């Protein structure tokens, strides 16, 4: 026996079931995507935070039977900048308590309150602006309870569709593999050993977040799929 949650959004349209839009996120029906941070006539604005959550909570681990879920998620986004060298602040995939609400914008990416506090969240960040706690350039990072990434890898920005796959397995390895549509052989990877049950409650919600600060860019989400499996019997 197992407890499974799975979904596959190949596009986003108004009134899509099982999604919770938070902050500034809206649906763009003509482009069949989610516009994560606010735009005025297609131009991104400062100090915006937007998020989308999957409505059904995920059973991440079970204390009684001492089991942890494994999962895989994939999504495609497009970060557009008029000037490729100037913008902010990025997109994250995150797992958080089921009552999670948007936090601070800018470099906090809608999932952290500030630089000091411990947040009940695990995230993969696609960070497009180097804050004081960040490496020097745009990067992909794995964050466990803190805005300061546990591990990062450099990531060059292009105005192109970017596809990400994140897996978490029974060996407690969280790994990220990602590429631009026009350069599919150029793969950005990062992985870390993460014990999710030490960082998160047994039930979580999953989502994607984005934020702008003083600098801006478009953050648009075009597809998102997910599957988690929690073994329920103690034999497996």
From Swiss-Prot:
Coiled-coil stretches: none
Keyword terms, alphabetized: Glycoprotein, Lectin, Mannose-binding
Molecular function terms from GO: D-mannose binding
Superkingdom, taxonomy of origin: Eukaryota
Database matches in InterPro entries: ConA-like_dom_sf, L-lectin, Lectin_LegA_CS, Lectin_legB_Mn/Ca_BS, Legume_lectin_dom, Leguminous_Lectin
Glycan-modified residues: 118
The keyword Chloroplast is annotated on this UniProt entry: no
Function: D-mannose and D-glucose specific lectin.
Self-association state and partner proteins as the record states: Homodimer of noncovalently associated chains.
Record family assignment: Belongs to the leguminous lectin family.
Stated name of the protein: Lectin
């Amino acid at each position: 026996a197992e407890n499974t949650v799975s979904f596959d959004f190949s596009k986003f349209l108004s009134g899509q079931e099982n999604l919770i839009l938070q902050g500034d996120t809206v649906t763009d029906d003509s482009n069949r995507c989610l516009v994560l941070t606010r735009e005025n006539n297609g131009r991104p604005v400062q100090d915006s935070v937007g998020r989308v959550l999957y409505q059904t909570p995920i059973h991440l681990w079970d204390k009684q039977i001492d089991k942890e879920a494994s999962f895989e998620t994939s999504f495609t986004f497009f970060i557009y900048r008029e000037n490729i060298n100037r913008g902010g602040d990025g997109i994250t995939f995150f797992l958080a308590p089921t009552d999670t609400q948007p936090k601070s914008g800018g470099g906090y990416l809608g999932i952290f309150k500030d630089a000091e506090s411990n947040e009940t969240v695990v995230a993969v960040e696609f960070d497009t602006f180097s804050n004081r706690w960040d490496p020097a350039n745009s990067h992909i990072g794995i964050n466990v309870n803190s805005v300061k990434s546990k591990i990062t890898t450099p990531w060059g920005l292009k105005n192109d569709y970017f596809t990400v796959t994140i897996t978490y397995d029974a060996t407690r390895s969280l790994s990220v593999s990602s590429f631009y549509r026009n350069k599919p052989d150029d793969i950005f990877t990062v992985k870390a050993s993460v014990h999710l049950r030490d960082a998160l409650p047994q039930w979580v919600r999953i989502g994607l977040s984005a934020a702008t600060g003083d600098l801006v860019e478009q953050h648009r989400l075009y597809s998102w799929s997910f599957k988690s499996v929690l073994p329920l019997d103690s034999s497996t």
